[in-house]
Amino acid sequence: MKKRLLIVDDEPSIGLILEHYFSKEYDVVVKANGHEAMSWLQEGNFIDCIVADFEMPLMNGLDFIRQLQVSTLYKNIPLLMLSGKDETSTKILCLKHGADDYIVKPFNPEELDIRIKNMLKKIKI
């Protein structure tokens, strides 16, 4: 059975590229912002890993992390943040609040895949 990957990004092109790249290996779900993603999760949908953008409308990446962290259902789901910000302070903020990894746009999909696999390996231990 395929692992389910949730992509949360307000740039439709990012969602399409990642869905295309990962669909052979993962069951990919794409949502446009943190609010939409949280609503989908709260409907009872299960996810194995989340890749979310930092800068999004309605609910930004940091607020999305905070929402995940207050829930016993979601706080242990591996979470990788994407961002166009290559600032140490932003990376530290995301990691400090519960993100497991952080990658800067533009990124190499192969590197993203390796990071996702590494996060998923850790939850098997």
Q: Model-predicted segments: where are they?
A:
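Receiver (REC) domain active-site loop signature in two-component systems and cognate sites
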Residues: M56, C94
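Two-component/phosphorelay signaling modules centered on CheY-like receiver
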Residues: P12-V29
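C-terminal output helix
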Residues: F107-I116
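Acidic, metal-coordinating helix/loop segments flanking the phosphotransfer/catalytic sites
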Residues: A32-C49
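The feature encodes the CheY-like receiver
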Residues: G15, P57, E87, K105-P106
